[in-house]
Swiss-Prot record:
The protein's name: Probable pyridoxal 5'-phosphate synthase subunit SNZ3
Top-level lineage group: Eukaryota
InterPro entries: Aldolase_TIM (IPR013785), PdxS/SNZ (IPR001852), PdxS/SNZ_N (IPR033755), RibuloseP-bd_barrel (IPR011060)
Gene: SNZ3
Keywords: Lyase, Pyridoxal phosphate, Schiff base
Pathway assigned in UniProt: Cofactor biosynthesis; pyridoxal 5'-phosphate biosynthesis
GO biological process: amino acid metabolic process; pyridoxal phosphate biosynthetic process; pyridoxine biosynthetic process; thiamine biosynthetic process
Xref: Pfam families: SOR_SNZ
UniProt keyword Lyase, yes or no: yes
Naturally occurring in which organism (per UniProt): Saccharomyces cerevisiae (strain ATCC 204508 / S288c)
Length: 298
């Protein structure tokens, strides 16, 4: 079995689960108790990164290690786009997965990390099929929608998953000849065989999770019904008044996403949820609510 197949197999093990952002071992324990399939260890959740206006880098490895020691579920950590040395450090730390994340300040505005150079599986964000396939070609073992992290507004995540699905369907219908496939692969900057495999299967060849703006059980179920295979929850849980109850509810909603009776049950009496900010209030050039993080990446 190829090393890439091993890495994609590890990512497949998370399918149907919820991955939660945590900033302390105590939060990681809450996430594990609530049924999270993995946690993302970071020093600040995306909502706080967005407000800070500062350069956001890889978290302190000591903090990540403390979280790794606190739980038995897999632990992920983020690196800046293109910062392969941060990735080398996290691989040496033996994190379970690395997220090359647009939420952090990019280290390289031209290149993403060549992920085939690492044994640890990588997660990457994408807002359309071209981005997803470019990241997979670089070695990403899991794709997630970019959404708009730190907002509590799920609309961008919805837009990204529906766009990827629509592009796959459109290309399946419209690409007929070898020259059609070659032209589209050139346009997307990906190998023809990768494009053909994706269209033949009718979906990405790696697991595709939802991320960015998920704040309620209904948000999680919506994205699962739209075709996502699991959910990342960032700022939403620990910006709420009852994090453990909300975390349990989102896990239940992700599992029972097509059961309205169960969704009604888990959506009730959750306390105050994350207030959030709407996508429309974010100035793409920056401002009090920060930049459009989903536009970062190429």
């Amino acid at each position: 079995m190829s090393e890439f197949k091993v890495k994609t197999g590890l990512a497949q093990m998370l399918k149907g689960g919820v991955i939660m952002d945590v900033v302390t071992p105590e939060q990681a324990i809450i996430a594990e108790r609530a049924g999270a399939c993995a946690v993302m260890a970071l020093e600040r959740i995306p909502a706080d990164m967005r407000k800070s206006g500062q350069v956001c880098r890889m978290s302190d490895p000591r903090m990540i290690k403390e979280i790794m020691e606190a739980v038995s579920i897999p632990v992920m950590a983020k690196v800046r786009i293109g910062h392969f040395v941060e990735a080398q450090i996290l691989e040496e730390l033996q994190v379970d997965y690395i997220d090359e994340s647009e939420v952090l300040t990019p280290a390289d505005w031209t290149h993403h990390i060549e992920k085939h150079n690492f044994k640890v599986p990588f997660v990457c964000g994408a807002k359309d099929l071209g981005e997803a396939l470019r990241r997979i070609n670089e070695g990403a073992a899991m794709i997630r929608t970019k959404g708009e992290a730190g907002t509590g507004d799920v609309s961008e995540a919805v837009k990204h998953i529906t766009k990827i699905k629509a592009e796959i369907q459109q290309y399946k219908e419209n690409l007929k000849t070898e020259s059609d496939f070659a032209a589209k692969a050139t346009e997307l900057r990906v190998p023809v065989d990768l494009l053909k495999t994706t269209l033949s299967e009718g979906k990405l060849p790696v697991v595709n999770f939802a991320a960015g703006g998920v704040a309620t059980p209904a948000d999680a179920a919506l994205l699962m019904q739209l075709g996502c295979e699991g959910v990342f929850v960032g700022s939403g849980i620990f910006k709420s008044s009852d994090p453990e109850k909300l975390a349990c509810a989102i896990v239940e909603a992700t599992t029972h996403y097509d059961n309205p009776a169960k969704l009604l049950q888990v959506s009730s009496d959750l306390g105050d949820l994350m207030g959030g900010i709407s996508i429309q209030s974010i100035n793409e050039a920056g401002g009090k609510n920060g930049a459009r993080l989903s536009e970062i990446g190429w």
